């Protein structure tokens, strides 16, 4: 009888393990219901007054319950000798408003510079952006609507461009081709020789916020980390938004060190996984740089017994992407690394991250570190405790297992 019971328990355990493995590979396994009111529309002030849910990494069978903290408690939670790796990318004013040669108002979102002053961009409305189409940009949405004010418009703003006196300050771009991969357009900007578009975006562009932020009063600088240095992202590495200069100083005083990588966050961050078997998902490419100084700091930290804590999923992708040869190396280029449960970690041991969208590649990445079922259980606790979700929301800290 004892052997029969043991065999039955073994079969049940094996069956449960098989079910969990199947769900790890299934898109449905990463779904959860979030009350809309928990989607943060504005950041907290000060930044480090956000809440912090602290959990231990990966299923050991005796996980301690999550601990509820405030983000400014971080120096008391981490250990001296730990190393925080941060993404120093800077969000560019990548959303521009303009008029086509027909007079129709248009909106574009810059994605990446393919060559000097030639940018891949998403366009809206997208159906009639044919090769050779000219676009005039002037001073954001308000500027483009004021342009031509007083001219009697017909057919929903479709007067020829010649009916509108050109504003004194404007940009011109020409559609070169359609990009099959994104559905966007390659635009060539007509600028004075030696001048780059990035230098002019503060004048003509606006900081793009994620589509789920619909009622924000946040200032542009609140969607930048305090250590942002390298322009190129179209979305912020949001785990870093919780840090203040004072908190960074306090961490240094506790011998909790900091190093930087760069990953320019792209539009793929907001694109859902659409294949039912997540192992078939093709990850978008993003540009990363892992400098040699950061590699040396990581090696020294590990040698001294310190822990490597990534600040955000973008740092995870940068570090792990630079270690795909088996060992972390200085790297500058693109990565399309997709991390999901079963991934063999090479560099990262702990993670600070916000709460992510259902069925997203970011949720799968975090599941690879902590386990999908444990992560969804933690999310349910966070929802019950009224944590704020997504870009302007609260954070969680996943500590390395002992």
Q: Which ranges hold each PLM region?
A:
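Arg/Gly-rich low-complexity intrinsically disordered repeat tracts
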Residues: 141-153, 157-168
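Surface-exposed, charge/polar-rich loops and edge strands
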Residues: 2-140, 167-402
